[in-house]
Regions:
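Domain-level signature for soluble enzymes in the chorismate/prephenate branch of the shikimate pathway
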Residues: 1-364
Length: 364
């Protein structure tokens, strides 16, 4: 390709950039108008709702359906996610609490779901995320609920038993672990590897093969592991890209997780109900009588209706010894007639039934 041809293409790209810039600016101005309309139509004492999970899910799905490449559907959706995030910040900046500290996979999940134009607040524990949302100190919270390798996150399930909360969304994050070192690390003298206990478990085979005699130290989070390594010459950390960037670490080895499909599912918790989108999930908690066949009675309505169960977990109940509650996720929205019928049947047999929320299936 000649220099003249390259120059012509660059001129064309510059022209396209100007058009993209103007269209994004026009969209932002439109978002500001939306905010004005919402504020002007509020009743006295009514709180405006600027973030609509069902609306954002619909926009992203439409983008992915209409995308013709060469960018992948996910790449295109991420671009639009950031545009929407920035436009929403013009209406009202969202405050989002997440399980911290900075640099954790939970923060990465929050950024993936809400974009980078939110005010993100790290919390020291999962229960603190719940309490911030309940108190109205933040708009939403992000908490891990299950990992494809390690299973359910029990602290999150138990927090749903203690707090009245609405699940507003979900986000799935591929978990890639890297062995990280600092500038002063002597890589041939590594005698200690820090990470969260779950991450150490998810990289067990790799560690056994490459660092069988090195001490493995479990810490509160992968971000904490990265922070410690920055000041030690004989240590390494297992963490992700966000922690590496935050603490200025480099990758000694990449993607060391034992399972290449390792992923974690996170829930978005808040205080607002989400209308149906046509592609939703519902999460419920059910307590049944402690008698033979109780679980069978619980599952029969799902089988008869053909509703797709996506997850079922059991946790000890807080009401008595040797009693349990079931956490169930299934496809559908609690406003759907079929789902309503199933929930009514379950309620008639259950000691207690609580709908945690219906929300759009993860788009990204």
């Amino acid at each position: 390709m000649s220099e003249q041809e390259l120059k012509a293409l660059r001129v064309r790209i510059d022209s396209l950039d100007e058009k993209v810039l103007e269209l994004i600016s026009e969209r932002a101005r439109c978002a500001q108008e939306v905010a004005k309309v919402k504020m002007s139509s509020l009743a006295e004492g009514e709180v405006p709702v600027f973030y609509r999970p069902e609306r954002e899910a619909a926009v992203l799905r439409r983008v992915m359906e209409r995308n013709r490449g060469p960018l992948s559907n996910e790449e295109m959706a991420r671009l639009f996610r950031e545009i929407m995030s920035s436009c929403l910040a013009l209406e009202q900046p969202l405050k989002v609490a997440y399980l911290g500290p900075e640099g954790t996979f939970t923060q990465a999940a929050a950024m993936k779901h809400f974009g980078h134009a939110v005010i993100s607040l790290p919390m020291a524990a999962i229960d603190e995320v719940f309490r911030e949302v309940v108190a109205g100190a933040v708009n939403f919270g992000v908490v891990p609920v299950e990992n494809s390798t390690e299973g359910a996150v029990n602290h999150t399930l138990d927090s749903f038993l203690e707090h009245d909360m609405v699940i507003c969304g979900e986000v799935e994050l591929r978990i890639h672990h890297h062995l990280l070192v600092g500038e002063s690390t002597k890589t041939q003298s590594i005698s200690r590897i820090y990470s969260h206990a779950q991450s150490l478990a998810q990289c067990r085979k790799w560690l056994d093969a490459h660092y069988p005699n090195v001490e493995r130290v479990a810490v509160a989070s992968n971000a904490e592991a990265a922070k410690r390594v920055k000041g030690e010459w004989n240590s390494a950390a297992i963490a992700g890209d966000m922690a590496a960037g935050l603490y200025g670490l480099s990758r000694l080895a990449e993607k060391i997780e034992d399972r290449p499909d390792n992923s974690t599912r996170f829930l978005i918790i808040g205080n607002q109900e989400v209308p149906p989108t046509g592609d939703d999930k519902t999460s419920i908690i059910v307590s049944m009588s402690n008698k033979p066949g109780a679980l069978h009675e619980l599952l029969v309505p799902f089988h008869e209706s053909g509703l797709d169960l996506t997850r079922i977990e059991t946790r000890p109940s807080r009401s008595g010894k040797w009693t349990y509650v079931f956490f169930i996720d299934f496809v559908g929205h609690h406003q759907d007639p079929l789902v309503k019928s199933v929930l009514e049947k379950i309620s008639s047999e259950a000691v207690a039934l609580k709908v945690l929320g219906s929300y759009p299936k993860a788009v990204l």
